[in-house]
A protein has these predicted regions:
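Electropositive, glycine- and tryptophan-enriched low-complexity nucleic-acid-binding patches
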Residues: 89-151
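Acidic/histidine-rich, metal-coordinating catalytic segments
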Residues: 142, 151-162
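Short, amphipathic alpha-helical "recognition" segments used to contact nucleic acids or chromatin
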Residues: 1-8
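Generic beta-sheet signal
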Residues: 62-64, 105, 153
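Electropositive nucleic-acid engagement tracts
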Residues: 8-97, 162
Length: 166
């Protein structure tokens, strides 16, 4: 509950924390860091999504899968919790390679009838994502959304410039 309040309104959370015993921001961040979220399509996200979707009425299951790519500053980081270096290309969500990434591709699903949204997956790549990789990821994500009980009506792409296959 504290996480939901904190994400909805930081100011509101601070005000309520003066009245109620709510966890600190540090505690919330420590709890979030325990959730195993890695680049690619994550079972944790889709398992939780399926649980939530099972309680929705039929019209609330209509949704759009959205994706967009953004540039990043190339950077390598040691994740102390996993003892792995991060910042490398992971654009074929099954593989990681030694190329330093400078772009992130993010997938999200959003309700069309009811106003809800959920991040689904992300990958890192060098330059823009190649079209063959995007098709593979998009197919996998739409399939997983349908398996979770969602009714994907359309896809929406941001201003992504996709590389053609070489």
């Amino acid at each position: 509950m504290g996480l939901i309040l904190h994400k909805q309104s930081g100011r509101g959370y601070r005000a309520l924390s003066k009245i109620f015993a709510l966890p600190s921001k540090k505690t919330i961040m420590q709890l979030l860091n325990r959730i195993p979220i890695n680049p690619g399509v994550n079972d944790v996200i889709f398992n939780n999504l399926a649980e939530v979707v099972s309680g929705l009425d039929e019209s609330s299951k209509y949704c759009a899968v959205m994706f967009d790519e953004m540039s990043l500053d190339p950077h390598i980081h040691l994740n102390v919790a996993t003892k792995e270096f991060e910042g490398f290309e992971t654009n074929d969500d099954e593989q990681r390679n030694a190329v330093i990434a400078d772009h992130a591709l993010v997938f999200m699903v959003r309700g069309l009838v009811k106003n809800w949204k959920q991040p689904l997956a992300y990958t890192f790549c060098r330059s823009s994502t190649k079209s063959v990789i995007l098709v593979r990821l998009l197919t996998k994500i739409i399939t997983r959304c349908q398996q979770a009980g969602l009714k994907v009506i359309c896809t929406i792409c941001g201003n992504t410039c996709i590389q053609e296959s070489h």
